[in-house]
């Protein structure tokens, strides 16, 4: 998934793996649940050495807006070399995935900066800076948006995403390069909120807009800054 030789950083590896699994299971007449598809795709990616959270894989496998809490990836990766596939897939991985029916109406956007994400070395540097305080605060901010979506609390949703964005800035300046800062600033003065997505340092950012008029302004600002709109989806009460 690329344009002019530049790869889109929006979970394309996970997309390819999930779609390949679905194609094979369809060919052989097998019916896999969303959970089974997720676990099989995560298994494949872990075996390849992928170090991601697998959150993108969960979204793709469930084809829905979800709350996601990752499993112990290190433990499962170690078992891949020790146990058969059937045994690993049959285990309770400890993953938490819940479908969300939002009580808010909003546009969800993905903007592409056309710049590569930070390198694996920089990712490792960022990981080394992660503290217990950072983990505690981010966990709180993962729970708040779920509650806000279910309760229709727009301002709490916006505040929480802003807090996560601030935590990432404090964690490492490498996460928000200039293009991602522009992507985020484009939401200022609008009924919108934007932040980086994925590893950071480039690739993609996301935005939520709670006003159709502001959605148009946001996209125009992105376009003027050379940021491509890769994806748009409307969620909520009037979808």
For each feature predicted by the language model, list its residue ranges.
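C-terminal nucleotide
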Residues: 1-6, 26-30, 39-51, 57-199, ...
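DPxDG-like acidic metal-binding loop motif
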Residues: 9-31
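Conserved short hydrophobic patches within well-ordered secondary structure
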Residues: 16, 204-206
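A sequence/structural signal of beta-propeller blade repeats
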Residues: 34-35
